[in-house]
């Protein structure tokens, strides 16, 4: 199975790549959409300067495609970017790090369907606390690259996600999504066993 991974450099996209490899799939490249502005509907923007390094560490060629901002435009640009590489890369599918966002998963599935590609979200509906704890226990160095929700201390930006910070996220009265799936925070993986 030859797959293209949507890669942001965050914990979920990196874990999705490693999960796909664990299934025996050939992850042939990473694809990063580069929105015109920072307020993208679907795509992770804080790590754009670092994602090349993440791809290099993963041993993946990185494909970058410009992306207009807007609910429809982002999906159109994703589809155009994938369509442009489908044949040259002999793709069978797309891999994403979607955890719980129906918004993302459905749109990626529609793109795959229209292009005749299978879509995989190997982390979909994982038990979030266990998932995050397993990454931390496995030695992943995950940094907060953006804090966007009230209640999460802004000084965590740039800091490491630790078991203590994960516990604090779980206890917060404002109840941000513990994995940041709604954009409450964004992450960058600096190191992982892979």
Give the ranges of each region predicted by the language model.
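Nucleotide-activated chemistry modules centered on ATP-dependent adenylation/adenylyltransferase
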Residues: 1-194
